[in-house]
Amino acid sequence: MIFIDACFRKETPYTPIWMMRQAGRYLSEYQESRKKAGSFLELCKNSDLATEVTLQPVEILGVDAAILFSDILVVPLEMGLNLEFIPKKGPHFLETITDLKSVESLKVGVYKQLNYVYDTISQTRQKLSKEKALIGFCGSPWTLATYMIEGEGSKSYAKSKKMLYSEPEVLKALLEKLSLELIEYLSLQIQAGVNAVMIFDSWASALEKEAYLEFSWDYLKKISKELKKRYAHIPVILFPKGIGAYLDSIDGEFDVFGVDWGTPLTAAKKILGGKYVLQGNLEPTRLYDKNALEEGVEKILKVMGNQGHIFNLGHGMLPDLPRENAKYLVQLVHAKTRR
């Protein structure tokens, strides 16, 4: 698999490409699958439809890897927090974590309940071309914790940070509990058939450096270290969004570092490129315009050259991006990097 070879810095015929949120609303096929499911959460839980959606961007765009269609919040959902998705607003938990008692009341061993995820993986792997990789994923402990404490997405993360500074032991108990679940959750994804795993730390930038390293990065390192110990042949990709200023403190046992669009690729390459393969980092809105897209691709390829790079966006696809430009991006990267 070209994608897996690239994760391990092996020679590839061209630079592989996939896109975060490549299965999404910009595809009419996705909209149809979502309509059939009835709701976003039901789409995640319906393995037949989730498989369909996972495969769509591979078939339509020609990307080199599929990423499992699911949501990072299925883990806290199964741990006992009722979840709803509010149209135009996003996820909302009906209960939140407020103290040690609420942390202790969370169910453990819920990775065993996520069979709908593993069924999607095994179905997708059966239908996916042997040349294409399937990526599994989860959210980072810190990012999941913020949703569980705030109850929804936040601009200030005030409740989460208040807990971090005034009751750090409560937050650490939650992060520890989540970490243990996530290690087993990703392990079962691997056993079900994924070829690589990725951890999304979407709200990494909410924390100052010292707090980030202690309350997020340390837990990411713990998870990736255990996974590499169990499955050395499976690449681990970490994507902590918005921590370009903290790159000099990044270390640990993983294979690929996801670079967001706000972090200069030159800096990431200089600091991390010798140790980790870099993934990224086209600004997603460049897909609105072909000239802007071409310019962005040119800049990235000039910095990264032929090895140690997986092409991706620096964040997720937007719902109204023109699909023909997404397809063009894949063709462009393949053509420009063919060795």
UniProtKB/Swiss-Prot annotation:
Coiled coil: none annotated. It comes from the Bacteria. Belongs to the uroporphyrinogen decarboxylase family. The gene is hemE. Catalyzes the decarboxylation of four acetate groups of uroporphyrinogen-III to yield coproporphyrinogen-III. Keywords: Cytoplasm, Decarboxylase, Lyase, Porphyrin biosynthesis. This is Uroporphyrinogen decarboxylase. Pfam families: URO-D. It is found in: Cytoplasm. Its EC number is 4.1.1.37. Substrate binds at residues 21-25, 40, 71, 147, 202, 315. Pathway: Porphyrin-containing compound metabolism; protoporphyrin-IX biosynthesis; coproporphyrinogen-III from 5-aminolevulinate: step 4/4. GO terms for cellular component: cytosol. It catalyses: uroporphyrinogen III + 4 H(+) = coproporphyrinogen III + 4 CO2. The record marks 71 as: Transition state stabilizer. Homodimer.
